[in-house]
């Protein structure tokens, strides 16, 4: 979780930012995994923003042991467009897997009671989340809670590879997908 400066232009759910935690290392792109206003403010009144960073490469693997609470970071952005509003004429089906769920978490936070806007283009959604092992998935509990409380509704189907539940075009079609 990062505190944002007053100069932050604001972001939309699912955008990304370039973040630099160390001046010796260049900035890296990370998805913003929180909706505007979803995390509130810190004691100094600064808006908060969440990044979800999976330790996949040489750089991200070292972050957990190198970063410290209160450490300054440089955040540039936001960038990109990941719009979950869609069209009233078409049902939305969201498919995500692993850390690729982070932009969807931000979209789901924007659909929570108190944060949800009265945007007429927001439609109910079918969401499919693919995970290697649901029992060990660090994001699944949060995802389930957000989907259960979303306005309008988001129906979540979890595809747990550890239990042989893989998402295929045939599975998607059988579940009422496009």
Model-derived features: where do they sit?
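A short, basic/flexible loop-to-alpha-helix module at the beginning of a structural domain
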Residues: 78-88
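Ferredoxin-reductase
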Residues: 1-74, 92, 130-133, 144
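Short, glycine-rich nucleotide/cofactor-binding loops
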Residues: 93-102
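Histidine-anchored nucleotide/phosphate-binding helix
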Residues: 101-118
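Reductase modules of NAD(P)H-dependent flavoproteins
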Residues: 51, 58-67, 71, 118, ...
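Conserved hydrophobic helix-helix packing surfaces used for dimerization/oligomerization
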Residues: 92-93, 125
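Short, flexible hinge/linker loops that cap or flank conserved catalytic cores
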Residues: 43, 85-87, 119-121
């Amino acid at each position: 979780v990062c505190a944002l400066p007053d100069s932050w232009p604001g972001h939309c759910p699912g955008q990304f930012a370039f973040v630099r935690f160390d001046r010796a290392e260049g900035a890296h792109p990370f998805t913003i995994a929180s909706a505007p206003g979803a995390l509130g403010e810190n004691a100094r009144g600064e808006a908060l923003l969440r990044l979800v960073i999976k330790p996949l490469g040489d750089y991200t693997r070292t972050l957990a042991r190198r970063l410290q609470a209160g450490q300054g970071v440089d955040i540039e952005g936001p960038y990109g467009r990941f719009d979950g509003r869609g069209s009233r004429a078409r049902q939305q089906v969201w498919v995500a897997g692993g850390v690729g769920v982070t932009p969807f978490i931000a979209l789901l936070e924007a659909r929570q009671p108190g944060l949800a806007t009265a945007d007429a283009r927001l439609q109910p959604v079918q969401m499919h989340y693919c995970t290697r092992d649901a029992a060990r998935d660090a994001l699944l509990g949060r995802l389930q809670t957000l989907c259960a409380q979303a306005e309008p509704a988001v129906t979540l189907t979890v595809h747990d590879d550890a239990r042989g539940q893989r998402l295929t075009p045939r599975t998607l079609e059988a579940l009422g997908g496009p």
